[in-house]
């Protein structure tokens, strides 16, 4: 086991604080509408230019191991805020730095760190309650666009695109961000249920100009097994032919004789038909087939529940207004399912989302809800260069998360105003003893730090602005973009309550742990001389050239 280097008390805390300051100082220059860029060197390719706090934090690794521990703990604050709300990483870092710096001063003055931490925790609980009181619901398109704009660093086109996407696919809809091919940002909305399985044979194509198979008012047969024997399909095919409607078959697979017969029937015009594989695998496939059945008012033909394909009738088939199939995807538009059944299914999946333990499962379940309830929107980010594309995509992702958070828990006045109001409301709060009260004061003073940093980045004097805002009431704050005072919500400067709350809670949590740190342990650096000494005896090999 390698020897360890141990530091105690004030030495340990000072080293840790130095690391915190290096990371936080690099991150906080990006805060606010007039925040600066940070350039990150990459081992290959062009440097990355970013205004995204968490991207800057992730790149920072310090040489001194004790300082690095401090930096890594604050990096954790940014990551946690990013995971919880998708934004607010820079705010969380600024808050953490302020609480740690003030807290360590109090510890150096001889205060009990545990009581300080209790005071900080008490202030945060009170602050979260105050934030809830200040929060305003965010439901209209204009407010959603404003939140998106602020989070995308005042890029109005991004805010508007996200608002349009949410309007089209609903609050629950899936919105994904992709890299586009042009210079302009685009919004692509897929209505209805789309899954990533294409036609099983190109002979099903009936629109050669678009390379798609399109079926109008089709019956939809859902089968939870492989179909290879055409005899099993004959009763359904005959019924569909009599009804003079097209047929879509969604099965685990359709192969051999069954597929060949379907192709021949389709080409001869006897029955207009197309076949695709069912989406997903294993239990997820069964669940998704059931989703499609509910959406189209059909029944999944499954031997597990004693149903045989040969005995299927037209009553077992689902129906939709239209189905479009290309080589990669199938889209079912306007399924004829009953709204009540669809709502029940959505509620059931939402319950599963709450119980899910892994992010992957949660994401897949969320997609299923979106496909049943709304649709899927794709925002294609346009840019002139690769470097700009990466930077812009990160901003759009942030903005999307922020708008989701805003819809979830509402919005508060932006620009750090809400936290200043909260600190003002709690100024009479006291702890169980004097040291807890000092902890409360540390947290309340730190709540002014985001506004101070936004103002400093805009080139103004932070103390003057903070005092002016404190003198005001409600949503009165300072708009750093226009250098004007006024009602922040009316000016469209909004922050999602969830983002502000998460930033404060995570910052206080990690800062509290760091204030109560008394010792730090790390590996001693290895002695390089020893390693070189072992190879020293090889020096004489140079003379072997004469032996050739």
Swiss-Prot record:
User: Organism source for this protein?
Assistant: Proteus mirabilis (strain HI4320)
* Gene3D superfamilies attached to this UniProt entry: GroEL, GroEL-like equatorial domain, TCP-1-like chaperonin intermediate domain
Catalytic activity reads: ATP + H2O + a folded polypeptide = ADP + phosphate + an unfolded polypeptide
Chain residues that bind ATP: 30-33, 51, 87-91, 415, 479-481, 495
Full protein name: Chaperonin GroEL
What CDD domains is this protein classified in? Answer: GroEL
Write one Gene Ontology MF term.
isomerase activity
PANTHER family named among the record's database cross-references? 60 KDA HEAT SHOCK PROTEIN, MITOCHONDRIAL
Q: Kindly give the SUPFAM superfamilies that the UniProt entry links to this protein.
A: GroEL apical domain-like (SSF52029), GroEL equatorial domain-like (SSF48592), GroEL-intermediate domain like (SSF54849)
Q: What is its EC number?
A: 5.6.1.7
The keyword ATP-binding is annotated on this UniProt entry: yes
Give the PROSITE patterns listed for this entry.
Answer: CHAPERONINS_CPN60
Q: Which InterPro entries match?
A: Chaperonin_Cpn60_CS, Cpn60/GroEL, Cpn60/GroEL/TCP-1, GroEL-like_apical_dom_sf, GROEL-like_equatorial_sf, TCP-1-like_intermed_sf
Q: Can you quote a single GO CC term?
A: cytoplasm
What is the stated purpose of this protein? Answer: Together with its co-chaperonin GroES, plays an essential role in assisting protein folding. The GroEL-GroES system forms a nano-cage that allows encapsulation of the non-native substrate proteins and provides a physical environment optimized to promote and accelerate protein folding.
């Amino acid at each position: 086991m390698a020897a360890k280097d141990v530091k105690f008390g004030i030495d340990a805390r000072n080293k840790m604080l130095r690391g915190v300051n290096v990371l936080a100082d690099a991150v906080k220059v990006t805060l606010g509408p007039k925040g600066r860029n940070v350039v990150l060197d990459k081992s290959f390719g062009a440097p990355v230019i970013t205004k995204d706090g968490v991207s800057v934090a992730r790149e920072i690794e310090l040489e001194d191991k004790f300082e690095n521990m401090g930096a890594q703990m604050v990096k954790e604050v940014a990551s946690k805020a990013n995971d919880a709300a998708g934004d607010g990483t820079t705010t969380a870092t600024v808050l953490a730095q302020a609480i740690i710096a003030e807290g360590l001063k109090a510890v150096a003055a001889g205060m009990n760190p545990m009581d300080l931490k209790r005071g900080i925790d008490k202030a945060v609980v009170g602050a979260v309650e105050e934030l809830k009181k200040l929060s305003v619901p965010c439901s209209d398109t204009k407010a959603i666009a404003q939140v998106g704009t602020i989070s995308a660093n005042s890029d109005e086109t991004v805010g508007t695109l996200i608002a349009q996407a949410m309007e089209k696919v609903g609050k629950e809809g899936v919105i994904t961000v992709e890299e586009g091919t042009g210079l302009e940002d685009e919004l692509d909305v897929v209505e209805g249920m789309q899954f990533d399985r294409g036609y099983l044979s190109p002979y099903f194509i009936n629109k050669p100009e678009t390379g798609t198979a399109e079926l109008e008012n089709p019956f939809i047969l859902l089968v939870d097994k492989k179909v290879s024997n055409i005899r099993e399909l004959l009763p359904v095919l005959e019924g569909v032919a009599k009804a003079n409607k097209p047929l879509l078959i969604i099965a685990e697979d359709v192969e051999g004789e069954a597929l060949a017969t379907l192709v021949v029937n389709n080409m001869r015009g006897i029955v207009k038909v197309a076949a695709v594989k069912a989406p997903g695998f294993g239990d997820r496939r069964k669940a998704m087939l059931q989703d499609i059945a509910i959406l189209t008012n059909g029944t999944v033909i499954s031997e597990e529940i004693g149903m045989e394909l040969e005995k299927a009738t037209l009553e077992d088939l689902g129906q939709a207004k239209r189905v479009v199939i290309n080589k990669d995807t199938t889209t079912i538009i306007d399924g004829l399912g009953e709204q009540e059944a669809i709502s029940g299914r959505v509620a059931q999946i939402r319950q599963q989302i709450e119980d899910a333990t892994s992010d992957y499962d949660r994401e897949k379940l969320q997609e299923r809800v979106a496909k049943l309830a709304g649709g899927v929107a794709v925002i294609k980010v346009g840019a002139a260069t690769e470097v700009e594309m990466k930077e812009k995509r990160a901003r759009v992702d942030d903005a999307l998360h922020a708008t989701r958070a805003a819809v979830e828990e509402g919005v508060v006045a932006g620009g750090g105003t809400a936290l200043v109001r909260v600190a003002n409301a709690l100024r009479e709060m006291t702890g169980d003893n004097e040291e807890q009260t000092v902890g409360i004061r540390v947290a309340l003073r730190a709540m002014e730090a985001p506004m101070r940093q936004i103002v400093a980045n805009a080139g103004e004097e932070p103390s003057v602005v903070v005092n002016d805002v404190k003198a005001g009431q409600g949503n009165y704050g300072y708009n750093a973009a226009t250098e004007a005072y006024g009602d922040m919500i009316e000016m469209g400067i909004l922050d999602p309550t969830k983002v502000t709350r998460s930033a404060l809670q995570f910052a206080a949590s990690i800062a509290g742990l760091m204030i109560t740190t008394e010792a730090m342990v790390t590996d001693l650096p290895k002695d390089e001389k020893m390693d070189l000494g072992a190879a020293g005896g090889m020096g004489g090999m140079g003379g072997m050239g004469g032996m050739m």
